[in-house]
C-alpha cells in the first residue's frame, strides 16, 4: 500500500486519479504546483506505471549520497546539542514556555537543503487537511474551512509531545507507505542513505522545534493519518439512528495545524467517540506521541469558540476577539499620545506593534482598517506611516 499525494490546480480538479493514470493529456509534472495548498491523496497497491516513468530513483539515491558526503562532519558530529542555540518562548496560550532549538547557520543550511531536496521529489508534501507550514496557508485559512462548512459544534484535540516524541524509527516506518520514499526504502542502498540523511534532523531522539526541516517532515509523516482520519470523519456514525433503524451519518469537517486538531459539524455529534477513534488510530500507527485528553474541548459557536488564536463567532465571522480589539485601540491611543509628547517607543515595541496590526488586518481587514482610520482622523496623522518613519534609522 502506498499513499500518493499531489497538488490539485484547476486543470485537474475535476479529473480522477484513475483518469490521470490512464493518460489524460495533462503532464504529471503539473501536479507538483498550484491548488493554493489544496491536495489530493490516493492509496494504491503499488506506484502506477505512469508515475514510475517519471520517478528517477537512481538520481534520488545519488542526491542522498552527495548530501551525506557534503555534510559528513555534521552528521557524525559527536554532540549535536552543541550545534544548536537553546532558548524558550512563551506559548500563545500563555503560561507555559515552548523550548526552541535553533540550529547554527551551517546546520540550518543543511536542513533547508534536505527539505528542498525531499520536497522536490514529491508531487505534494502535505495532506489537504494540513494547514501548518504550508505555503499560501495560514491559521485563518484553517478556520475558514470550518466557516464555509457552516459548522455549529466544534471539538479541539491536542497531541502531547508531537515534535520531541517523534523518532527516526517512526518517520522511516511512515515513509515506507509514502511515495516516493517507499521506493527509496525498498532499495538497500537507498534505505541506508535516507536513514543517514534523516539522522541529521534529530536531536536527543526527537524532532527539535526551530529547524526548517521538522515542520516539513511532520506534514509528510502524517499523510497516512490525515487521510485515514479525514475519510473516517467524512461518514462518521456517532451511534444515532433514523426511525427505520439505519445509522445517521454526520459529515464532519477536519483540519490539523501541527499538533492541533479541530473538527466541526453542523449538528451535535459524539465527540467522545471521535476521541476514541483518534486514540485507536494513533495506536494502529504505533505513534510515539499521544493524545492529551485533558485539552480536549467541545463547544459551539455560541460560546468562546477559539481556534488557533482566532474566534469563529455565533454570526459566523472570524475575528481576533473583543479583548484584542480593546487592546489594539488602547495601544493606538497610547502611541499617538506618546508621539505627540515626544516620547519615543523602542524599536522592538514598534516592530511588535506593527506586526500585530498587520496580522489583525489579515484577519479582519475592513474592521481593523476602520479602527485605524478613526484614530488617523482623531490625531490628524497616518498610523502606519508614523510607525514606518519611527522605525527608519536616524542619520548620524
Regions inferred by a protein language model and the residue ranges of each:
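Right-hand nucleic-acid polymerase module
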Residues: 1-91, 95-204, 208-211, 216, ...
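Short beta-strand->loop micro-motif that forms the acidic, two-metal-ion catalytic signature
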Residues: 259-266
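Short beta-strand
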Residues: 252-256
Amino acid at each position: 500500500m502506498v499513499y500518493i499525494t499531489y497538488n490539485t490546480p484547476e486543470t485537474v480538479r475535476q479529473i480522477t486519479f484513475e483518469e490521470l493514470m490512464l493518460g489524460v493529456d495533462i503532464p504529471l509534472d503539473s501536479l507538483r504546483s498550484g491548488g493554493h495548498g489544496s491536495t489530493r491523496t490516493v492509496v494504491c497497491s503499488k506506484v502506477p506505471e505512469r508515475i514510475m516513468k517519471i520517478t528517477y530513483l537512481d538520481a534520488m539515491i545519488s542526491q542522498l549520497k552527495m548530501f551525506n558526503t557534503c555534510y559528513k562532519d555534521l552528521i557524525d558530529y559527536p554532540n549535536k546539542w552543541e550545534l544548536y542555540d537553546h532558548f524558550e518562548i512563551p506559548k500563545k496560550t500563555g503560561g507555559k514556555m515552548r523550548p526552541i532549538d535553533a540550529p547554527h547557520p551551517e546546520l540550518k543550511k543543511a536542513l533547508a537543503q534536505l527539505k528542498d531536496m525531499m520536497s522536490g521529489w514529491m508531487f505534494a508534501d502535505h495532506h489537504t487537511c494540513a494547514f501548518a507550514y504550508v505555503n499560501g496557508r495560514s491559521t485563518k485559512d484553517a478556520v475558514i474551512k470550518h466557516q464555509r462548512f457552516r459548522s455549529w459544534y466544534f471539538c479541539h484535540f491536542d497531541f502531547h509531545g508531537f515534535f520531541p516524541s517523534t523518532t527516526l524509527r517512526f518517520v522511516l516506518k511512515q515513509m515506507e507507505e509514502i511515495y516516493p520514499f517507499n521506493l527509496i526504502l525498498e532499495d538497500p542502498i537507498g534505505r541506508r542513505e535516507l536513514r543517514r540523511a534523516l539522522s541529521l534532523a534529530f536531536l536527543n531522539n526527537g524532532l527539535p522545534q526551530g529547524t526548517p526541516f521538522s515542520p516539513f517532515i511532520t506534514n509528510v509523516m502524517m499523510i497516512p493519518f490525515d487521510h485515514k482520519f479525514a475519510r473516517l470523519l467524512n461518514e462518521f456514525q456517532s451511534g444515532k439512528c433514523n426511525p427505520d433503524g439505519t445509522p445517521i451519518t454526520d459529515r464532519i469537517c477536519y483540519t490539523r495545524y501541527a499538533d492541533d486538531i479541530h473538527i466541526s459539524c453542523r449538528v451535535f455529534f459524539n465527540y467522545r467517540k471521535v476521541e476514541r477513534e483518534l486514540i485507536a488510530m494513533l495506536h494502529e500507527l504505533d505513534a510515539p506521541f499521544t493524545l492529551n485528553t485533558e485539552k480536549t474541548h467541545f463547544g459551539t459557536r455560541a460560546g468562546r469558540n477559539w481556534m488557533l488564536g482566532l474566534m469563529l463567532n455565533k454570526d459566523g465571522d472570524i475575528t481576533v476577539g473583543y479583548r484584542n480589539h480593546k487592546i489594539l485601540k488602547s495601544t493606538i491611543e497610547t502611541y499617538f499620545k506618546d508621539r505627540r509628547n515626544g516620547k519615543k517607543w523602542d524599536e522592538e515595541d514598534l516592530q511588535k506593534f506593527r506586526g500585530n496590526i498587520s496580522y489583525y488586518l489579515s484577519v479582519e481587514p475592513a474592521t481593523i482598517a476602520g479602527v485605524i482610520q478613526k484614530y488617523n482622523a482623531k490625531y490628524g496623522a497616518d498610523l502606519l506611516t508614523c510607525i514606518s518613519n519611527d522605525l527608519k534609522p536616524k542619520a548620524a
